[in-house]
A protein has these predicted regions:
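Secretory/exported precursors with cleavable N-terminal leaders
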Residues: 1-167
Length: 167
C-alpha cells in the first residue's frame, strides 16, 4: 500500500470530521477513487452521526469547511466479505456460463499506507497572517469508512470500525 494515496484533506462538519484520502488516478480510464473516513467528535457519537447522515437529503448541503490537519492517527484495519452471487445474478436475468459464482472482497489499511499521509501532515507553506486552527484527526473511537469512485458516485466499500484499538 505504500504510495497508494497522493493527496488528502480534512473537512469539518458540525459534530464530525471527514478525512478524504485520494488514490492515484486509473491509468487507462482516468477514474478517481478515494477513501473517506467519517469520525464523530464524540467517542460514542457514531450512531448519532449515521442517523444525521441518513436523514439529510442528498441535495441539501451540510455546512462544512476545509481545515488544516494537526495530529493524524488512523488505526490499521482489515475487513473481508464473501458470498455466493449465483442467485442474485440469475434474478437479474443473466445467463451464467458457470454453475456457481462467488464474490469476495477485502480492504486493508495499515500503518504503511497511513504513514505517508501522516508524514506530510506537518508540511506547511509560508504565508502572512495568523496561523489557521489545526484540527486533530485521531480515530481512536468508532468511525465509518468508505471507498468511492468520484465520477459515478459509486461506493465500492462501506464499513464501520467499532473497536479501533491503536497499535
Amino acid at each position: 500500500m505504500p504510495g497508494d494515496f497522493f493527496s488528502y484533506h480534512l473537512d469539518v462538519y458540525p459534530g464530525f470530521k471527514v478525512l478524504s484520502l485520494s488514490y492515484r488516478k486509473g491509468r487507462c480510464d482516468g477514474r478517481t477513487f478515494s477513501m473517506q473516513i467519517y469520525l464523530p467528535d464524540e467517542k460514542d457519537g457514531l450512531p448519532a452521526m449515521l442517523e444525521m447522515l441518513a436523514s439529510t437529503p442528498e441535495d441539501e448541503d451540510t455546512p462544512s469547511y476545509r481545515a488544516d490537519i494537526g495530529e493524524l492517527k488512523i488505526p490499521r484495519f482489515k475487513f473481508g466479505y464473501h458470498f455466493e452471487a449465483t442467485e442474485a445474478l440469475k434474478s437479474l436475468g443473466l445467463s451464467l456460463p458457470l454453475e456457481r459464482i462467488f464474490h469476495k472482497s477485502c480492504i486493508q489499511v495499515d500503518e504503511v499506507g497511513t504513514e505517508a499521509a501522516a508524514a506530510a501532515a506537518d508540511v506547511s507553506v509560508g504565508a502572512c497572517g495568523p496561523a489557521e486552527k489545526k484540527y486533530d484527526f485521531v480515530a481512536d473511537h468508532p468511525f465509518l469508512f468508505l471507498v468511492k469512485e468520484w465520477r459515478s458516485g459509486v461506493v465500492l466499500f462501506l464499513g464501520q470500525v467499532l473497536d479501533p484499538s491503536m497499535h
